[in-house]
C-alpha cells in the first residue's frame, strides 16, 4: 500500500479508517534536517491515532525560510519520514498557496486531532481549523535549541 498520498486519497483513507473506529491525526511541517524534536513531536502525535503528515513543498519552505532552504528536497524528506515507525501517511503539499488551501485540506481529511508544537507560528490558524472540523489540538513542548534552522546555522558556521 502506498503511504504517499494526495489530498483526495487521504480523504478517502481517513473516511475508511474513521468508519473502522480509528482516530486520525494531522501533523504538518517542513521536516528539513530531521532532529530529536521532530521525532518526539511525531511520537506524541502518533499516540492519538493514525498519523498523516502534511509535508511542506520546497517552494513553500523557500518562502518561509529563505532561498537556501530546504537543505533536503521534498522527495527525500518524504522517504525519510516514511522510514519512521510513527508515520502512517505523508501528504506532500504541492500547490498549497495560502491559508484557504490549508483550511480546505483539513476540512476534507476531517482529523480527530491536529498536532502542534508549543509556540507554532501557525498555532491560531491550526486551532481554528481544529474547531471547524471538531478536532482536538495535541500540543507538544518545543525543545529549546532543537530546530532545523539552528542546525543549518551550525553547519554553515562549521563549513566556513
Tell me the role of every PLM-derived stretch.
Residues 1-160:
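Nucleotidyltransferase catalytic core that binds NTPs
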